[in-house]
Structure formats: C-alpha cells, structure tokens
Amino acid sequence: MNAESGSAVEVFRTVSVPLTQARAFALFTTRMTEFWLKEHSIGASELAEVVVEPRNGGRWFERGVDGKECQWGRVAAWDPPRKVLLLWQIGVDWQFDPEFETEVEVTFSEDGLDRTRVDLRHRNLQRYGDKTDQMRAIFDDPAGWTGTLAGFVDLADAQATSLH
C-alpha cells in the first residue's frame, strides 16, 4: 500500500504483559519515560521525561534535560483502563506540526488471569503523502514501535515481579 492508493496505512503491534488491565494501562500512560527509546526525541537536549496528560485534550510531550518541552501531540480519547488514543502530530521533518496528525491507539484487554493484551495501532500514515512508505518503514522497524513495546514489556515484567 502506498500513499497514492488512498487506503489507510498503519503499523500494528501486540504484546501481552503479566499485569491486570488497570495496572497495564497505568504503567503505559504514567511511566512512558521508563520504556521510551531515548534516541526517539525531537528536542535539542537529551530526553528527560515523556508526559501524557491524563485527560481528553491533554498534551503528549517530551521534556528535555534542559527543561524545555517539545509537544508530540495530544490525547484524543482517555478511557482507563481500556484505551488511550494519542494524536501523533510530528511531521516527516520530525517537528511538531499542529496542523498534522496520525493516530496512535493503544488498547488494553484482559488476556487470562492477571495478564493484559496490549494492542498498539499507529494509523493514518497515508497522511504523510509521498513519504508514507518511508515513515511506515520507520515505525515498522525493530527500533520503532516494536522496540518501544519491548521496553514496555520489560518494565511490566519487572513490575509484576516486584508485586509478588
């Protein structure tokens, strides 16, 4: 699929973590700094913190070690413990663009006793126009959403171990 086809383009990943749905949601949304790949930063200084403001319309941004904030997007839907829908407003130049958005939907569903399935769908990548295939390849790369979710799984595993 390419941008010219007009079809929706997305990247989809799923993982299962040894936490309840509520704990998995809270861990993902409140401790993103701990699993976000540090090299995935758009700020001038080193990444210090990733913040998801816990409400519809909240900001999604990074704070650098210099204290400066760089907005990534906003929270379009806040539905704990089931779903968070984040608007990714970073263009092909890796800068925040308030006029541009793709969607990162993360859902949390029970997956057995004290386990949660986490589905991440980064959709509407066709909005990158003639750079759609390039951007999809970046998000689809092992260093993209796969790496981010691997960090989340590691954090969830450590959290589950500390609970027992």
Predicted regions and their residues:
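Hydrophobic/aromatic beta-strand elements that line small-molecule binding cavities or substrate pockets
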Residues: 13-15, 50, 72-77, 101-110
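Hydrophobic ligand-binding cavity/cleft-lining segments
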Residues: 1-47
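Intrinsic-disorder/low-complexity, polar/charged segments enriched in Ser/Thr/Lys/Arg/Asp/Glu/Gln
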Residues: 8-16, 59, 70, 83, ...
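Hydrophobic pocket/interface hotspot
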Residues: 24-28, 60, 75, 86, ...
